[in-house]
C-alpha cells in the first residue's frame, strides 16, 4: 500500500520541475507509461523530495540525465499516489462525475477554481503535459497515449473514493474517475484556457500583495534596527559596564523616539483583496 504522507505544498516545487523536464524532453516517446521505471531511481526521487533536497540540486540531477523517461513517468504516478490528499479533492468527486457526464464545461471550470492554488497549479501543468502527449502526431494512433488510456492510468491516482470491498462499487468508481480524467484531457483547451487566465490573475495579485507586504515589513524592520544600532554605538563601545544613569538615558531616549515617531506619516499596510 502506498504511504500517503507527502504534503502537496512540500512536493509542488519538485513535481513542477519534473513535469517541466518531462514535457520538454520525453513527450515524443510512445512507451512512457507502459514500461516500469527503475525502482531504485524512483525511490531516490521520492527520498530527495522527503529530505527537502535543494531545488537547484534536484533540477541539476534532472538535467544531467540521471533518470530515464520511465523513471520520471512512474515517479509522477508515485508522487501523486503518495500525497496525503488527491489533487482532485475527494469532496468534489460528485461534482466532477456529474458535470463530466453531462459535459458541463462551465461548471467544471467553477469546480476547478474552488481548489487551493497549490492543487490547481499542479493540475494545470499535469493536464498541459497530458494534452501535449495526446496531440503528438506520432501518438495519435497509439492507444496507450489516448485520453481514455491516460484516464484509466491516472483514475485512482488523481481521484480517491471511500474504501469498499464491493467489486461492483470499485469498478463503478474506476469508470467514473476514468471518464472525468479523460474528459479533462479531451477538452483541455475549452476547460483550462480561461481557468489558466483566472488562476494567473489571482496568482499575480497574490505575488504583488506579498511583495508589498515584504517591502513594508523590511522598512519597519530597517527603521527599528537602525534605531537600536545608533543607541548601541553611542553607549556600548565606550563603556563595558553601564551605570544606572546610562541605562536610564537609553530608556528615556528610546521612549522619546518611540512616541515622537507616532506623528510621522507612515506607509499604509498593504490590504489583501
Curated annotation (Swiss-Prot):
Domain (Rho-GAP): residue spans on this chain: 1-192
Q: Annotated Gene Ontology MF terms?
A: GTPase activator activity
Q: Which keywords fit this entry according to its UniProt record?
A: Cytoplasm, GTPase activation
What SMART domains does the record point to? RhoGAP
Subcellular compartments = Cytoplasm
Q: Which cysteines are joined by disulfide bonds?
A: none
Question: What GO biological process terms are annotated to this protein in UniProt?
Answer: signal transduction
Q: Does Cytoplasm count among this protein's keywords?
A: yes
- This protein's name: Rho GTPase-activating protein gacB
Tell me the organism's taxonomic lineage: Eukaryota, Amoebozoa, Evosea, Eumycetozoa, Dictyostelia
Amino acid at each position: 500500500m502506498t504511504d500517503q504522507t507527502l504534503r502537496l505544498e512540500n512536493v509542488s516545487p519538485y513535481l513542477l520541475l519534473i513535469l517541466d523536464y518531462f514535457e520538454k524532453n520525453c513527450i515524443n516517446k510512445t512507451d512512457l507509461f507502459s514500461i516500469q521505471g527503475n525502482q531504485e531511481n524512483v525511490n531516490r526521487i521520492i527520498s530527495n523530495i522527503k529530505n527537502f533536497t535543494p531545488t537547484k540540486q534536484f533540477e541539476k540531477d534532472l538535467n544531467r540525465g540521471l533518470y530515464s523517461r520511465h523513471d520520471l513517468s512512474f515517479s509522477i504516478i508515485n508522487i501523486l499516489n503518495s500525497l496525503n490528499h488527491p489533487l482532485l479533492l475527494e469532496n468534489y468527486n460528485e461534482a466532477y462525475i456529474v458535470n463530466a457526464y453531462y459535459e458541463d464545461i462551465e461548471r467544471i471550470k467553477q469546480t476547478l477554481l474552488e481548489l487551493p492554488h497549490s492543487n490547481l497549479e499542479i493540475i494545470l501543468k499535469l493536464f498541459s503535459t497530458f494534452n501535449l502527449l495526446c496531440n503528438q502526431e506520432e501518438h495519435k494512433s497509439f492507444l496507450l497515449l489516448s485520453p481514455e488510456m491516460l484516464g484509466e492510468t491516472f483514475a485512482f491516482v488523481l481521484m480517491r473514493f471511500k474504501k469498499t470491498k464491493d467489486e461492483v462499487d470499485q469498478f463503478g468508481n474506476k469508470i467514473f474517475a476514468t471518464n472525468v480524467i479523460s474528459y479533462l484531457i479531451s477538452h483541455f483547451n475549452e476547460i483550462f484556457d480561461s481557468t489558466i487566465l483566472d488562476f494567473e490573475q489571482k496568482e499575480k495579485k497574490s505575488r504583488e500583495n506579498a511583495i508589498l507586504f515584504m517591502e513594508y515589513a523590511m522598512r519597519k524592520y530597517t527603521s527599528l534596527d537602525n534605531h537600536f544600532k545608533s543607541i548601541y554605538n553611542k553607549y556600548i563601545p565606550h563603556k563595558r559596564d553601564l551605570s544606572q544613569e546610562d541605562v536610564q538615558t537609553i530608556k528615556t531616549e528610546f521612549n522619546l523616539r518611540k512616541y515622537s515617531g507616532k506623528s510621522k506619516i507612515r506607509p499604509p499596510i498593504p490590504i489583501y483583496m
